[in-house]
Design a protein with these regions (language model features):
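Glycine-rich phosphate-binding loops that contact phosphosugars or nucleotide phosphates
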Residues: 1-110
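Active-site phosphate/pyrophosphate-binding segments
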Residues: 81-82, 98-177
Length: 177
């Protein structure tokens, strides 16, 4: 049943140094990279493949990570907000996990879930459009700050790191640490 399916969030840079005592050749790993070139992820994929771990990636199949895992193990990420943008990554990861549960007999309504969520991107775009005026206010207020600190915990920790490191630090060269 679903009680014996263990799920762990592992950061590639940490795993490259410390490993994970529960990872074996029977493990399945899902990673994501919009750029397809994240060095820590590439290093981890190499080590995991040596262990016989099955690695799947949400990335461009023609990028470095896509080539490392094999195109047949890739799902293209969507940079286009109309196609889901960042939220599509969450959706795809959820679908991956739910399909695993489905194949184990723990989520028999997987196909119904997929059918019911197929038009979610239009709604997400409408929500973004409604928030745009408030986003503009926040941007004007904080855009020129010398230093910005982002704090997240629990379920928001990973999203906080993603936003601050990938979007602000790597793409906009903002000092965030």
């Amino acid at each position: 049943g679903d009680r014996d399916l263990e799920v762990y969030l592992i950061h590639a840079a940490e795993w490259n140094v410390m490993g994970h005592k529960r990872m074996t050749e029977r493990s399945v790993v899902l990673t994501a990279s919009e750029s397809g070139t994240t060095p820590e992820v590439l290093e981890a994929i190499g080590k995991m493949k040596e262990m016989g771990v099955r690695v799947y990636a949400m990335t461009n199949p023609e990028g470095k990570i896509g080539r490392a895992v094999g195109a047949e193990n890739c799902v293209m990420m969507a940079s286009d907000h109309g196609a889901g943008g960042c939220e599509k990554g969450y959706y795809l990861a959820d679908c991956f996990g739910l399909r695993l549960l489905n194949r184990r007999g723990c989520f028999p309504k997987f196909d119904l879930f997929i059918e019911q969520t197929k038009d979610i991107w239009k709604d997400m775009l409408d929500i973004r459009k409604r928030f745009e005026p408030r986003a503009g206010e926040l941007a004007r207020k904080y855009a020129l700050a010398d230093y910005t600190m982002f704090i997240g915990s629990g379920a928001l920790w990973g999203e906080t790191v993603l936003y601050s490191m990938c979007l602000l630090e790597e793409m906009q060269w903002k000092r965030i640490r």
